[in-house]
């Protein structure tokens, strides 16, 4: 995680009014990291009720209102969300059948602001180099991250 955030600081200043979305947030470690790095707003989406409750409890303990935990299905959230974010992180289960659709859904629904960064954590067998928004791929041990960027030339406005 530390290595990833070191890379991300080349692209984003988390203390400069950044809004973030943490998808498949699990126990909320990325959401907590984003709040601690100065994000103005973090929406944390997790389906599991125990994980969601844990995130709520941690945010209460650290006395922050900068994280908004949402319990729900990530794909439904993506379809219904009308906000845009500077930074999106997704850590879906590696065996998720439609994992490879996540980047196109993020861009189709216009969730990322222009020049925003989307990071997808995934297994070694997923490849996204042909995606028009692909920036770079990083791997740290068995963990793989692909970074995507929203650019004005590559993006189509979301269809309603």
Question: What does each of the following model-derived ranges do?
Answer:
Residues 1-160:
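Class I S-adenosyl-L-methionine-dependent methyltransferase catalytic core
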């Amino acid at each position: 995680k530390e290595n990833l955030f070191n890379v991300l600081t080349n692209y984003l200043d988390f203390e400069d009014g950044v809004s973030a979305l943490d998808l498949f947030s699990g126990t909320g470690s990325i959401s907590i990291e984003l709040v601690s790095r100065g994000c103005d707003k973090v929406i944390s989406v997790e389906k599991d009720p125990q994980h969601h409750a844990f995130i709520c409890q941690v945010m209460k303990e650290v006395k922050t209102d900068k994280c908004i935990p949402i319990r729900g299905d990530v794909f439904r959230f993506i379809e219904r969300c009308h906000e845009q974010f500077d930074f999106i992180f997704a850590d879906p289960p590696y065996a998720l059948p439609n994992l490879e659709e996540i980047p196109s859904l993020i861009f189709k629904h216009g969730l990322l602001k222009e020049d925003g960064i989307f990071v997808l954590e995934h297994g070694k067998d997923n490849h996204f180099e042909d995606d028009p928004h692909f920036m770079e791929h990083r791997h740290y041990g068995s963990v793989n991250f692909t970074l995507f960027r929203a650019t004005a030339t590559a993006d189509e406005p979301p269809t309603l």
